[in-house]
Amino acid sequence: MEVSFSSAFKKRIKGNADLEMKFWQKLEQFTAAPFDPSLKTHKLSGKLKELWSFSVDYDERILFYFTEDEKAVFVDIGSHDEVY
């Protein structure tokens, strides 16, 4: 699966070496199988109903959406409390 990153996403991940390392590991897994059960990929509801989320680790999440041509655009990354 092809992915792209919003400018806000790039800013959030830049400068956090630990989070960035975890992210690149999960990105490889996501591009191979976006709905792998270990990622816990799920559709959001409420004010974020247009977005999806998957887990980087116990507390860190990535928010993204699918485009019409089946690409994923990552829009936010952070702790559960930061992104929801």
What is the predicted function of each stretch?
Residues 2-4, 11, 18, 55-84:
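Enriched for short, Lys/Arg-rich terminal
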Residues 29-54:
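A short, surface-exposed loop/turn module that caps and links secondary-structure elements
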